[in-house]
Amino acid sequence: MDIRPIEGLEFSFPQAESDVLPSLPMRMLALGNSGSGKTTTLINLITDPRFYGKRPWERVYWCSPTAAADDALEPLRRYVEDVLKQDQEVDPTFHDHIDVAFLTKVIERQRKITERMKAMTPRPKKGFGILVVIDDLADARRNVLQSGQLVDSLFIKARHWGVSTILSTQKLRLPLISPCVRVNVTCVIVYRLRSKYEKTQYLEEYSA
């Protein structure tokens, strides 16, 4: 019997030509010590067209304690202004903490955009993708419960609405990196770790 796949309502997103890079929407974990090069790697991944093309995301949001002062973010600042034309007054890219209320609205907006696009006739083939980066905030003490729920939602549900998420951290076992987050990761970039213990933690988690 010839069983044909049911046509779904999924949209296509720009993808990397390399099999090493994860497909979009992605859920990435960047694990490494301070100064290991995580931020530089992520900036290049976002802005360099050799990875995912010129414009893989329509909006980018970057949460980091040094979001306003870090010179390493300058290429991203130029990218969101010159390429994405993202209005920094209305829809700011950079946040110095996990702004739960703001990001919740962003995710809800993505859900509505996706549902509206699915209802269109003819239905668009290309999805409206965005990227949320949480950089060195996995050990944040501010609004831990609400922030944890938001991060869980980003790694579990938000991908269905075209949301890619990157969590950059120095340690694997922290309050915001819940078991739900760890099992839903689609890509891990690991740098030199601080100790053999941290290396063992990583291997126990991901070397099944």
Question: Across the structure, where does each feature detected by a protein language model lie?
Answer:
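Short acidic-hydrophobic, aromatic-tinged amphipathic segments that line or gate anion-handling sites
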Residues: 83-101
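N-terminal pre-Walker A segment at the start of P-loop NTPase domains
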Residues: 1-16, 67
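Conserved P-loop NTPase motor cores
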Residues: 14, 28-49, 58, 65-69, ...
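Alpha-helical structural elements
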Residues: 6-8, 52, 89, 97
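Active-site catalytic pocket residues across diverse enzymes, especially alpha/beta-hydrolases
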Residues: 49-50, 80
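Phosphate-binding P-loop
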Residues: 12, 16-25, 52
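Short, aromatic/basic amphipathic alpha-helical patches
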Residues: 72-83
